[in-house]
Amino acid sequence: MELLAPAGSMEALRAAVCNGADAVYLGADTFNARMNARNFSAADLQEAVVYCHVRGVKVHLTLNTLVLDREMPRAAELIRLAASCGVDAFIVQDLGVVSLCRQLAPDVPIHASTQMSIHSLEGVMEAAALGCSRVVLARELPAEEIAHICKKSPVEIEVFVHGALCMCYSGQCYLSSVIGRRSGNRGQCAQPCRLPYGYGRFESTRYPLSLKDNCLAGELDELRRMGVASIKIEGRMKRPEYVAIVTRAYRTVLNGGKLMPSDLQELETAFSRQGFTDGYFRGQTGSDMFGRRQEGEDTADLFASARATYEQGEPQRIGVRFYAMIRRGEPAQLAVEDPDGNLCRTRGPVPEQAVYRSLTPQDLEQQLKKTGGTPYLCTAVRSSLDPDLMLPASAINAMRRDVIAELTAKRGRAAPARLNAYDEPPRYDGIAGEPQLTIAVRTAGQITSRMLSMKPTVLYVPLSELAEHPDLPQRVSVETQLAAILPRVIWSGELAPVARQLRTVYEMGVRQVLAGNLGQLHIARTAGFAVRGDFGLNIVNSRAMRYLREQGLDSQLLSFELTLPQIRDISKAVPAELLIYGRLPLMLMENCVMKNRTGICACQTGTVRLVDRVGEEFPIVKDPGTCRNVLLNGKKLYLLDKKDALRGMGLWALRLQFTTENPGEIDKVLMDYQGRAVFDAGSYTRGLYSRGVE
């Protein structure tokens, strides 16, 4: 099982390698989810790959952000550079970047980032079909789900075992971008989840979105038995000393050792938020998983000890064999071989006739084992010596240094990379004329007579609501297509009831599904449904749109992190939909904020609202069909008065999305859309369509 450690800087990389990492993951100056880390320039990247490969450590490059069309040429340059440097894998979020990696550097493995929100075997299967050789699972998964996925997965599985936990499923958090233009999907998360929030205007503030750090140091044997290929430590923003301490602890356990209470205390002192949690892994969510960063104990001595592990000397981690031949009248010969079969040779001086003492195999071995200060450990010496010869120790040492230097150069030399030229995808201008109307609701009770009379092209209804209202297909016009909204998270163990509901609505005549992640896409197609893509797929570029076209999607809702000019310019390889009204979904949460407040589930009794430091209220509702929470924006997105400006952008449809609205409020919005009245949206937002994100 691979130990994968973070490297936010060259110093952190050395800390990881010297403390037992099998692989490191790092980011370049651009296109990685930790843009506030020190990261690596082109020269740094080359140095890092050489340093790691010499020591038998793999390097995974993070390309795990969303990439805009105008940025694709720069992303292509980085991919080609990294491949030529010899990186061992790309960690990718964006579907368009996956396509780009496969085109430009087809021999470099692609790992599906946790930012892809993959949380089921179905999502893993879709990622494998996409060309990924490894999937990093969502942190929220319990042990039984991980075991099920590992048992049937066609690709390697990677699991986070230590470090920060986000309250939201990775890749589905828009809180930082919507309230401050700093997008987590672009590597700029401002971590507003770590701030205090109240449960109402008159309640004391708490930290209901701030989770403790994950720690699965005691679960590694279980993960190994499951078949997990790689365990991952979070922390590219952390100090090198932290990386050293945590990597060393997990290496100790992987090597069969046990962590003492003092070791666990060191982990907590290095960094924690009021302790650690294994709640997600154990399936035990709740209020005891939450904590916040506080000033802890003095770390000076602990960090000084950690620095010594990578600043003083170098661990000898690569076993090598030496082969020596000392013949009378011939130059001395020495060779060294590493475990990968790299063989390097050199010649030395002609040995002299011994006068006092002959060179023995023991003398030779003693000199050849002096590999201190290098990453190599001499494990064996084989020699063939003629008798009564003398060779100075200085000559043997010089030969040893020569072959070691040549071996180091060979191990650090990148294999020739197969690189292809960059090309732009074909452009599709989209649909001319007036965009269609689509409507999404949270409950069947929100479907009003006025809504049905407007004959929206598509009416999106949660799958569970559709299954419970078999009369809906008869109520809608033949000009309106019903589409089932799948639960945003469907663990493999939750698939059976979803499959039953899909069969039910199929028999009702529903033939379309709205999918927001790869797992949903797989489930829908397997069940025989046409697929429309939702915002959770995070589509921000033309290459991703082309991928969706290849997958046969009927339409795609573009990311609400795009600006209107970017929406205009993106290739409409599939019919493009735009959200113009509704509360933006900011977080999708496995932990129930409602239940954590009082210990009682409040899903059916009302809406909980979190209040931030400036008094902004954020409603929390449950994702239909599940008990998962969705944090909504306090302000409604409102672009109904901008419909004319949206013509000529190639859009297929404009979507109205209703969440907390009652039927009366919904009808007022619909009348506004029709131009029959002006809806007082109150405190509304134009979203990110004009502001954009960093």
Give each language-model segment a name.
Residues 1-18, 23-34, 48-49, 55-83, ...:
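Surface-exposed amphipathic alpha-helical tracts and adjacent flexible/coil segments at the periphery
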Residues 37:
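A short acidic, glycine-rich active-site loop
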Residues 40-45, 50:
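Glycine/small-residue-rich interface belts in oligomeric ring/scaffold proteins
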Residues 116-120:
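Conserved phosphate-binding/catalytic loop of the ribokinase/pfkB sugar-kinase fold
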